[in-house]
C-alpha cells in the first residue's frame, strides 16, 4: 500500500502534543521576534537538530528539546499561529479528528493567564477548522489539558479543564517524567475529575513499567493509557509457540476492559520505551504482539517535529514492518474513534466517514 493511499484515508489522532508539532520555519520566525536563540538558523538544520537530539534513547533528553518550542509559545500571536498550523497539518495528513494535548502551565512566562492560553489555542484551532471546512474538508479538534506530574498544579489544571469543557476541551492529561512522579501523588485530583465526569488519559508505560500503568489505572482512574507500550513487560508469549501465553494482573485488566493504548511507534523507539532492546527497530516494537493478543491498539505520532513523522508515516512504517492491510488500518482508526473523548454524535459521524472511505478504497 503506497504512502499516497494511506495519506488519503481518514484518520484519528489521539496522542499528539501541540508543543511537539511546530513547523521548523515557524519556530525560527517566532524566535526571531522574541530574541530567543536557537541551535540552528535555517529550517532544514533546525529540523535535523530536533531529530538528532531525540534519537538519544532517553526520555529525559527527548523532553529537553521542548525548551525551544515552548519558548515561542508564550504570546497570543504565537499560540494562535502554532495551533492553527498544527491543525492544518493534521488535516493535510488526512486526520479528521485530532485531540491536541499541551500543558497550559508551560505557557505563562510572558504574562498570559491559564485561561488566555486555552482560549488562544482554541482560536487557532478554530481558524484551522474553518479553513478546512471552507475547502470542503472535515476536521474536528478537541483540547486535552495537561498537568505536569512533577509540579504541584494538578488541581488548578483540572479545574481549568472542567471550566472549558464546552469550549474546546474534551479531556485531561497527565504528562512529564514518569519515574518518581506517580499519579498517586495527585489521587485526590483524579477522584475529583471522576466526580466531574471529565475524561482522563494519563501518560503511563513509557518512561516506567507496569507499576506506573497500575497507578494510572487505580489512582489515576485513566480511561486510556498514553503510550502504555511497556504493558508488554507484564505479558509472556512463547517465541516458539504463540499459543503459550500468560498475562500478569495489570495486562489482564487492560486487555479484558479494552483500555485503549495510545501507541506512538517512532517515539517509543526514540525515548527508550523498549529498555531491553539495544537500538530497537520498528520490527522490534511490540505493537504487533499487542494487536495479535487483542489489545485495543491505536496509532499515534506523539511529537511530529521530534520524530520527523506524520500519522501517515507511522501507519506506513507499521505496514512495512508487520504486513498490515487495509482492514488492519481501518480497525486502528475505528479503535481510536471509539476511544476518543468526542461527543457521541461526532463519534458516529467520524466512524461513518472512516467506514465509507475504507470500503471505497477496497475497490
Feature-to-residue mapping (PLM):
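Metal-cofactor-binding active-site regions of metalloenzymes
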Residues: 1-198, 206-224, 230-363
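Short HxH-centered metal-ligating active-site micro-motif
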Residues: 203
Amino acid at each position: 500500500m503506497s504512502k499516497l493511499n494511506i495519506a488519503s484515508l481518514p484518520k484519528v489522532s489521539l496522542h499528539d502534543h501541540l508543543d511537539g508539532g511546530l513547523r521548523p520555519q515557524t519556530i525560527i520566525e517566532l524566535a526571531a521576534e522574541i530574541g530567543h536563540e536557537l541551535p540552528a538558523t535555517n529550517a532544514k538544520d533546525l529540523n535535523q537538530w530536533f531529530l538528532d537530539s531525540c534519537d538519544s534513547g532517553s526520555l529525559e533528553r527527548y523532553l529537553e528539546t521542548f525548551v525551544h518550542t515552548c519558548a515561542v509559545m508564550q504570546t497570543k500571536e504565537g499560540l494562535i499561529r502554532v495551533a492553527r498550523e498544527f491543525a492544518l497539518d493534521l488535516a493535510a495528513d488526512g486526520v479528521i479528528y485530532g485531540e491536541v494535548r499541551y500543558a497550559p502551565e508551560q505557557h505563562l512566562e510572558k504574562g498570559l493567564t491559564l485561561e488566555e492560553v486555552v482560549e488562544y489555542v482554541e482560536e487557532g484551532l478554530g481558524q484551522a477548522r474553518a479553513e478546512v471546512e471552507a475547502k470542503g474538508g472535515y476536521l474536528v479538534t478537541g483540547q486535552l489539558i495537561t498537568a505536569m506530574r512533577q509540579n504541584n498544579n494538578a488541581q488548578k489544571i483540572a479545574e481549568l479543564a472542567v471550566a472549558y469543557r464546552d469550549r474546546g476541551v474534551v479531556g485531561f492529561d497527565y504528562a512529564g517524567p514518569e519515574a518518581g512522579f506517580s499519579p498517586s501523588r495527585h489521587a485526590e485530583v483524579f477522584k475529583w475529575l471522576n466526580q466531574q465526569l471529565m475524561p482522563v488519559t494519563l501518560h503511563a508505560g513509557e518512561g516506567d513499567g507496569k507499576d506506573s500503568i497500575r497507578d494510572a489505572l487505580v489512582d489515576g482512574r485513566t480511561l486510556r493509557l498514553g503510550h502504555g507500550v511497556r504493558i508488554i513487560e507484564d505479558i509472556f508469549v512463547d517465541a516458539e509457540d504463540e499459543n503459550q501465553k500468560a498475562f500478569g494482573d495489570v495486562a489482564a485488566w487492560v486487555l479484558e476492559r479494552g483500555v485503549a493504548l495510545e501507541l506512538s511507534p517512532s517515539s517509543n523507539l526514540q525515548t527508550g520505551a523498549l529498555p531491553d532492546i539495544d537500538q530497537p527497530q520498528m520490527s522490534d516494537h511490540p505493537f504487533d504482539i499487542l494487536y495479535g493478543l487483542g489489545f485495543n491498539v491505536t496509532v499515534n505520532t506523539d511529537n511530529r517535529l521530534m520524530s520527523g513523522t506524520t500519522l501517515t508515516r507511522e501507519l506506513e512504517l507499521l505496514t512495512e514492518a508487520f504486513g498490515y492491510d487495509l482492514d488492519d488500518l481501518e480497525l486502528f482508526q475505528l479503535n481510536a474513534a471509539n476511544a476518543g473523548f468526542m461527543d457521541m454524535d461526532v463519534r458516529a459521524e467520524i466512524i461513518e466517514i472512516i467506514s465509507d472511505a475504507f470500503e471505497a478504497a477496497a475497490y
